[in-house]
């Protein structure tokens, strides 16, 4: 059966913030791919847009924090500063070096890059090389796992058993772990799923490897989140405009205690997938809730 990631793009945001709060238990993680005017719009912001984003964060006193620091705080119950933001880039495209890197260094903003290591090893056009990453790493940029091959990890090959799939996927992720450690001298603790795709079986693989994982679904991360499928705000094209950017960084986490179904992968022929969310009974401002679904 052909499987497809269930991109409902459930854009569930509580849009009011509490300006009197000086500490928080949540953070907005921003996701970029290309920072260029010459790459596909669906995965790109222009250098001008990226600059506008950084300027907004600076001018409005956002605390831009290393992603690993955010995760440690959330897992241990430590407080985060109000208006917490973390910057991430997926795929290690060359614009991470030419456009993002000099700007984040200038602003003294930490940056995390999720690397699909096969593309780097093969020297594919438009990607970083290891020397560039070593230079970035020396200035504090964190490099994390994005798998080795950047394939659709949730999909089984033809006639592939569940056990064989698990071994193949674990080996793919471990290869990326090894290559980053060999080249940069650090062992990743984080992974972002290629294409944001995950299912319950893949989450179990990630758990067995001791990794914290991110998807591409929108939302703030917080202390009660699932650390095998943390949300990020994808920024590209229309969704990188300042009007939507400001809403994302000013949102609050969605306080749910459960969801059904747990597995976000559905058959391709399922045209009416359903999602049930169970809210924390103590949630405030429930009337502020908005739901936007691609359809």
Task: Please report, for each region that a protein language model flagged, where it lies by residue.
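N-terminal pre-catalytic segment of deacetylase/amide-hydrolase enzymes
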Residues: 21-85, 249-263
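Short, compositionally biased P/S/T/A/G/V-rich stretches that sit at domain boundaries
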Residues: 235-269
